[in-house]
Amino acid sequence: MVVLDGKKLSQEIKAELKTKVEQYKQEIQKVPGLTVIIVGEDPASQVYVRNKAKSCNEIGMASEVIELPASTSQEELLKKIADLNHNPNVHGILVQQPLPKHIDEFAVTLAIAPEKDVDGFHPENVGRLVLGHLDKCFVSCTPFGIIEILKRYNIETKGKHCVIVGRSNIVGKPMANLMVQKLAYMNCTVTVCHSATPDIATYTKQADILIAAIGKARFITGDMIKAGAVVIDVGINRIEATNTKSGYRLVGDVDFEAASQKASAITPVPGGVGPMTISMLLANTMKSFEHFLA
């Protein structure tokens, strides 16, 4: 059984990107720039934003975090995004979600220029993904990271049955649209399960590749997994743990111990898909930078 080490892979990707950033810095005195906007003081969002800025700094990318109060109006936020759209030193724009209730998240997504939408949420990028123009769009970072895991571990996907549990716009839907593409490390027969699917285990037991992204701790048990399946666990859930300093620990949507007995390969939580998501955000920012150079 192979543990698919996303932490190690993400370090490799960062090292590759760092080399590229240094080359551009020497040759043209320019580096990619990512700007992250955070509205309000959600503690989890603040941690994510800090991690993104730290990762940019590690590889020499320019990064800026714009912190706005929770009282910021939608109009003010859209004006800030418009300014960044026109700033030639900004190649990636990301607005950290969730946003305060009075701000329409879809209006914010639409406001970001598609060519700077490194999160891959703009309808133009989603449409290009569905049509298979992956070279001409930004792919949502978590699904992009999963493809990169499959690729770097050389996991055969062609003709395999891929079952995705979850249908979010961030993971489930883009993942399904990727896995049906006639491309290497995709090209699967795809089934999507969700909250209205009766007896999810019927489907998960048929999966050659099982991707769990529902946000329910250890929802996928060992008896729901086919022997020899590749299991990708996207979930990050806090559960109580009296023996830790914080009083909790992180687990995925899959019961790792039980699944390990059945799977041929599995991503751990933490250290699997999570670190890859941030590395792919950096990769998308580099792609945007190179697009603007061209």
From Swiss-Prot:
This is Bifunctional protein FolD. SUPFAM superfamilies: Aminoacid dehydrogenase-like, N-terminal domain (SSF53223), NAD(P)-binding Rossmann-fold domains (SSF51735). Catalyzes the oxidation of 5,10-methylenetetrahydrofolate to 5,10-methenyltetrahydrofolate and then the hydrolysis of 5,10-methenyltetrahydrofolate to 10-formyltetrahydrofolate. Belongs to the tetrahydrofolate dehydrogenase/cyclohydrolase family. The keyword Hydrolase applies. It catalyses: (6R)-5,10-methylene-5,6,7,8-tetrahydrofolate + NADP(+) = (6R)-5,10-methenyltetrahydrofolate + NADPH; (6R)-5,10-methenyltetrahydrofolate + H2O = (6R)-10-formyltetrahydrofolate + H(+). Homodimer. NADP(+) binds at residues 166-168, 195, 236.
